[in-house]
UniProtKB/Swiss-Prot annotation:
Organism taxonomic ancestry: Bacteria, Pseudomonadati, Thermodesulfobacteriota, Syntrophia, Syntrophales
Source organism per UniProt: Syntrophus aciditrophicus (strain SB)
Highest taxon of source: Bacteria
Quaternary context: Part of the 50S ribosomal subunit.
GO-annotated molecular function: rRNA binding; structural constituent of ribosome
Protein name: Large ribosomal subunit protein uL24
Name of encoding gene: rplX
Protein purpose: One of two assembly initiator proteins, it binds directly to the 5'-end of the 23S rRNA, where it nucleates assembly of the 50S subunit.
Amino acid sequence: MQLKHLKKGDFVKVISGREKGKTGKVLTVISEKNRVVIEKMNMVKRHQKANAMGKGGIVEKEGPIHASNVMMMCGKCNKETRVGIKKLEDGKKVRICKKCNDILDI
């Protein structure tokens, strides 16, 4: 299943879980698992093995969050919103805010 409502660079708000209420920027979309990685959210510790470029140790990095636990933030009305798809006159599909009908794609 492909995530059509979230893309890299979108601003989202976490609506459930440990990080509830926080907002951040989407770094990666993992559409096969229906998950997103958000900047400075769901920090997990990973044990890094040493390699030729650097030393090993315990590294803290962002972990994935399920896409159902986040909502898109509209840039115009500054509210979390559901995302709709609208077809323009030239045939191009764009994402729109369901609350203010503003185009979310840049």
